[in-house]
Amino acid sequence: MKTQILLFCLIALSLVVPAQKTVKSESKGSVLIAGGTLIDGSGARRREVDIRIAGDRIRQIGKLKPLAGELVIDAKGMIVAPGFIDIHNHSERGFANDPNAKSQVLQGITTLAIGPDGGSPFPIADYFDWLEKQHPAVNVVAFVGHATVRQRVMGKDFNRRATESEIARMAELVEQAMREGAVGLSTGLEYDVGNPATTEEVIALARVTAKFGGIYMSHVRDEADLAFDAFREAIRIGREAGLPVQISHIKLGTVGVWNKAGEVVRLIESARRGGLDITADCYPYDAWASTITVLVPSRRHDDRAAVKKGLDDVGGGQNVLITNCSSHRDYEGKTLEQIAKAAAETAVDVYMQIVRDGGASVVCQSMTSADIKTFYQQPWVMVASDGGIGMRHPRGAGTFPRVLGLYVRERKWLTLEEAIRKMSSFPARRLGLKDRGLIKAGMKADLVIFDPEKVIDRSTMTQPGLEPDGIKYVLVNGKTVVAEGKVADASGEILRQGNRN
């Protein structure tokens, strides 16, 4: 998705989705979730128990009787799981219009990490202060973006190698963000601001992150023909900087590398055997969303041969859907091929025109189900959306229900217990959230209650905001934020991470 590279304007933000009405949450006192089937997030087998919540914590698990005046949630026939934790989310600006984060909580997300792909709010402290005043419905963790600090230092002159003094200044900004509570450093090395950076520049900033116990999360430099070189670069950065690595939305996005997920797995597992703490996340769709310029990795957007190769690599202009184009609003919702036919031109002509006129956001259907399956079946790959509030891609509203409904119930790629681990305790541990991600006494009461026979996504490429089915209740910090599909009062927290060493 398009990297946010400028200081976020927190007052005069354009609307993304309409504000949502709320319903009042339950009165003070304990809550009993009765009769449900518990999947605790650890990967352990399910069991039928009751759960008592008092305040923002889980207090008891077992066969429990209601207390006088206690609110009881009937979970019979339902799965009770830890709230889903989205390690890769682009809701930074969406909270301005929809602090209830309806599209997020309705799919069971209780904690999300913003600032991926190299773009983040800055300063982090100012953003956190602003966000607290919005009273978000979900808990929020933040990464500091490499492209954000790079452009703050280099301005518009970013299309070159940074000098030593510029890298030193970037390092100061990364340290500032880590002290203000960032969980790690993110990069978007495929994007315009991050792409000119050398590996050595990123290593220098990652070393600063490592001093604070942070992690390195990367949208790697290439997800097409040079994907394997890009994965090796991420491994090198982790080794030389001495910190954990998270590969964002692991994928093989062009025809030339389709069905090579097994080779990627062998590369990553070799690094893991060598002692590197490297993991990845994956979203459950065969279409990616980004800026149109990534279709031509060489950045030779005025070279017809280079543009044609870029389009051929994703199966042609019919696979490239325009989702946001400020210079040509009439192009939105159409493919390059459709636009070209209407104008009696070629898809190459349309691409070059759009780039000349300022670019666009696109959804490109160019991944294989076989590769997605291979990635999801690795124990070191978690579920993440790469979505966010108002996202013009179905993953923004449907990621977690899609995994549960399509990949667990229908295709049986994963057990329900393993899928929930990939959505809860696994990302929690990656983010250093010690009291979230598991259902056990003393943990924060972030929970989701869903119908395992009905849960499924409904969002599509043409209707990306459709709400999923089957998510009945969502609790954040002990308060009900979703009850039978209605969004209730917000109760999220800002999870400042600080120094984790």
Task: List the model feature ranges, each with a label.
Residues 123, 195-202:
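Active-site-adjacent beta->alpha loops and helix N-cap segments on the catalytic face
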Residues 2-8:
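Sec-dependent signal peptide recognition
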Residues 117-118, 190, 220-222, 250, ...:
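Short, ordered loop/turn segments at secondary-structure junctions
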Residues 75-80, 84-89, 96-187, 206, ...:
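Divalent-metal coordination cores built from histidine and acidic residues
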Residues 10-18:
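Hydrophobic h-region of N-terminal signal peptides that target proteins for export
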Residues 143-144, 148, 152-164, 168-192, ...:
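Active-site neighborhoods of metal-dependent hydrolases
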Residues 19-49, 53-54, 63-64, 105, ...:
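Active-site microenvironment of metallo-dependent hydrolases
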